[in-house]
Design a protein with these regions (language model features):
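A short helix-breaking turn/cap at a secondary-structure junction
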Residues: 141, 146-150, 157, 162-170, ...
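Glycine-rich, small-residue loops and helix-cap segments
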Residues: 146, 159-160, 193, 248, ...
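Short helix-loop capping/hinge segments that flank enzyme active sites or metal/cofactor-binding pockets
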Residues: 153-175, 246-266, 422-436, 466-523, ...
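Gly/Ser-rich, acidic/histidine-flanked active-site/gating loops
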Residues: 165-167, 176-179, 184, 212, ...
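Conserved hydrophobic/aromatic pocket- or pore-lining residues that grip, position, or stack substrates
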Residues: 204, 226, 248, 254, ...
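N-terminal, positively charged, Ser/Thr/Ala/Gly-biased leader segments
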Residues: 209-270
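Short glycine/serine-rich loop/turn segments
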Residues: 243-385, 433-435, 473, 538-542, ...
């Protein structure tokens, strides 16, 4: 999903106790107070719908027609079924207990019902027609903008990292060794003309087609586009124009990221034939850097977990397991050497979980680092895009390429990163939680980093419930039409989004805003207790996943080893369970987490291990599609 996800942060202008991290575009305070009252009353009335007689068929058809773009039919100003209900016992009397607001007498309840029927329900319908006629949150973003910064400045646009120079990189003799090279190594082969982009594209497309039947990691092959982009990359190099380390390098995108002329399915059977005439900002950045798109990779349905309309994506290290998290395709494909890198997304765990399960290095960056226009939205205050790579060095190269201000994403900004390749480790104080992998602590300590025991202190009792309230309401706003037309009945996993989004209908606006105020309190308390430059902890601890996404903390997921699988087959197997840790930093300090991860990986080789995808054991088989050479 998310693995989980949270909704957009709100703050009323002028509120003395509101968090400084929750900003509102200029709107008069009085307008917001009045709008807030309308929203609260209407949410309550809508939640009481089951107590109201169902609308007649003509009214139902009118409501459905209201979603059609360009419809000129006037919306009904009043709903006779509501008026009919108001004439008897107050409809809200029984419903208010679901909102913990059963505090009004019958007279006040009737007054609320009449006001909602006259003012709020018509306004709701008009607003839905204006902004909710298309699902996915691609258009009409909210003007309420979450800023995760702890006071950092915006960086100059041209301030980029100083990448290490790789000398004496030689082309391996076989394609598999090439497939598991890092981005910088492949870039050096391209730059020195030891290999062409066309050749690399051939290698990775063959691997994708060979191993996808078992991993179920690809939704769409972008073969024609890939060869066109590879041809351009090779021609530019012949002309003496080198675009940088991503020049001619193949990659994959999670299939919630729009690319013109190709399907963007969001992993959902409802949208499996959808083609968007949109070019996502992150795709533009990669195209400008010379990268070659070879595939749209699996997203869990509507960016939730690893189940999608074509199956369920598997873990290359143990095909009896699944990849876990909605960026399943990017994680599995990178792990198996099917692409050198891929771009995924996280709202709550969809980068960290699949990276940890599949044993790849990944970066969930500071919120706002990478523009999200052209990307399906769950929560505008939580959604983030980040890279899956074979090393932290490659993650640094990728984030340097895709970061920056997206003019169509109000939350994106020029984050003031320092160069991770020039961080003085001996000046850092790094905390470690009880859940930290001790090998990482020992290795960094031996390299001059000061390591101290650490714990974050905050008073919020349940960060998970805070995350869920926020996420579910925001997601429902982006998929209101989808739910109203009954498409949730078609959803691939009925215990996931359908249940959560139905429950989201019962979140009052007042309590949603209280949740955002609580989020602001959490941010302040985490900032006050964050007395170190970074800390090391479990990358998949659910409390940390929820907290990190609510606050906007960056984290690098780092492979640290392997354990044996549970109940291995008697004949033996090379399947293993990956072990990882997370290196967390304050917002805008991604370079510190990257520098620490690079330091650890410079003296270890866990991240360079290859999954046993061709030698899984006597009871495992890898299907080879027809007309595809091994």
């Amino acid at each position: 999903m998310p693995f989980f996800t949270t909704a957009r942060a709100l703050r009323c202008s002028g509120g003395a106790t509101a968090s400084p991290h929750l900003h509102v575009a200029t709107v008069a305070e009085a307008t917001w107070r009045r709008a807030l009252f309308y929203v609260v009353v209407v949410v309550v009335v809508v939640a009481a719908a089951e107590a109201v007689p169902p609308p007649s068929p003509p009214q139902s058809r009118t409501l459905e027609r209201s979603f059609e773009m360009g419809s000129k039919e006037a919306l009904p100003a009043k709903d006779s079924s509501i008026k009919e209900a108001i004439s008897g016992k107050p409809v809200l009397k029984d419903a208010m207990k679901f909102f913990d607001a059963d505090i009004f007498n019958d007279s006040k309840l009737r007054e609320m019902e009449e006001g909602a029927e006259e003012f709020n329900v018509p306004a709701f319908r008009v607003n839905r027609k204006l902004v909710a006629s298309v699902d996915g949150g691609l258009h009409n973003p909210s003007v309420l903008v979450f800023n995760s910064s702890w006071g950092g400045k915006e960086a100059p646009q041209d301030k980029r990292f100083d990448y290490p120079c790789l000398c004496n990189v030689k082309r391996p003799s076989n394609d598999e060794d090439i497939a598991f090279m890092t981005v910088l190594e492949l870039g050096e082969l391209i730059r020195t003309k030891q290999i062409t982009s066309r050749e690399l594209t051939d290698i990775f497309l063959k691997r994708l087609k060979r191993y996808d039947p078992v991993l179920e990691a690809v939704i769409t092959f972008t073969e024609d586009l890939a060869y066109r982009q590879a041809k351009v990359a090779d021609e530019l190099l012949e002309q003496g124009k080198y675009l940088g380390p991503l020049h001619g390098i193949p990659y994959g995108l999670k299939d919630i990221i729009a690319v013109p002329h190709y399907k963007t399915t969001w992993g959902s059977k409802t949208f499996k034939d959808q083609v968007l005439d949109i070019e996502a900002w992150v795709y533009k950045r990669l195209k400008s850097a010379g990268a070659v798109l070879v595939a749209k990779l699996v997203s869990g349905s509507l960016a939730y977990d690893d189940i999608w309309f074509g199956g369920r994506t598997r873990n290359p290290w143990n095909i009896a397991e699944f990849s876990t998290g909605s960026s399943a395709g990017p994680a599995a494909s990178t792990s198996a050497g099917l692409v050198p890198f891929a771009i995924g997304s996280e709202t709550a765990g969809s980068i960290t979980y699949p990276a940890a399960r599949c044993g790849v290095t990944s970066l969930r960056p500071t919120f706002g680092t990478v523009g999200r226009s052209g990307v399906m939205s769950i929560s505008e205050s939580l959604d983030k895009l980040g890279p899956f790579c074979r090393s932290a060095v490659d993650c640094a190269v990728l984030i340097d390429t895709i970061r920056g201000k997206d003019p169509d994403d109000l939350s994106s900004r020029h984050v003031e990163f320092e160069d991770p390749f020039h961080v003085d480790l001996e000046k850092l104080t790094v905390g470690y939680l009880e859940s930290a992998e001790i090998e990482v602590v020992d290795v960094l300590s031996s390299m001059g980093v000061k390591l101290v025991p650490f714990k974050l202190n905050y008073s919020v009792e349940s960060v998970q419930s805070l995350l869920n309230i926020t996420m579910d309401v925001d997601m429902l706003a982006h998929f209101d039409k989808w739910q109203r037309l009954g498409h949730d009945d078609e959803y691939e996993a009925q215990d996931q989004w359908p249940v959560e989004l139905r429950r989201a209908r019962l979140v009052p606006a007042v309590d949603y805003i209280q949740a955002q105020r609580t989020r602001g309190k959490l941010i302040r308390e985490v900032r006050e207790s964050f007395k170190v430059d970074a800390f090391i902890g479990n990358a998949t601890d659910w409390e940390l996943v929820c907290l990190g996404n609510l606050v906007g903390l960056p984290v690098v997921v780092v492979p640290t080893g392997f354990t044996t699988i549970e109940d291995p087959p008697k004949g033996g197997t090379r399947r293993r369970t990956t072990v990882t840790t997370g290196i967390y930093a304050p917002p805008d300090r991604d370079h510190i987490a990257l520098a620490l991860a690079m330091a650890y990986q410079s003296v270890t080789d866990h991240h360079l291990q290859r999954p046993p995808i061709d030698d899984l054991g006597p009871d495992d088989e890898i299907p080879v599609p027809p007309n595809t050479k091994p």
